[in-house]
UniProtKB/Swiss-Prot annotation:
InterPro entries hit by this protein: Ribosomal_eL38 (IPR002675), Ribosomal_eL38_sf (IPR038464)
Subcellular location: Cytoplasm
Protein name per Swiss-Prot or TrEMBL: Large ribosomal subunit protein eL38
Coiled-coil regions listed in the entry: none
Protein task: Component of the large ribosomal subunit. The ribosome is a large ribonucleoprotein complex responsible for the synthesis of proteins in the cell.
Pfam families in UniProt: Ribosomal_L38e (PF01781)
One BP annotation, GO: 90S preribosome assembly
Coarse class of the protein's main subcellular location: cytoplasm
Family: Belongs to the eukaryotic ribosomal protein eL38 family.
N6-acetyllysine modified-residue sites: K9, K67
Length: 70
């Protein structure tokens, strides 16, 4: 089941949860999508600023499996 997250802080809290398994990063020409897989939902955060996306990628939890798609 998909869920959309609007705030970066909420996304980081979700990524730090115990049931968060992996993060997929999808890059398009106009935005970057961060998708975190938890046990029940797939949470998606859409960022249009490339610099913010790089900062967020650096601040993801170290134990989480990160996969870059395109």
């Amino acid at each position: 089941m998909p869920r959309k997250i609007e705030e970066i802080k909420d996304f980081l809290l979700t990524a730090r949860r115990k049931d968060a398994k992996s993060v997929k990063i999808k890059k398009n020409k106009d935005n970057v999508k961060f998708k975190v897989r938890c046990s029940r939902y797939l949470y998606t955060l859409v960022i249009t600023d490339k610099e913010k996306a790089e900062k967020l990628k650096q601040s993801l939890p170290p134990g989480l499996a990160v996969k870059d798609l395109k």
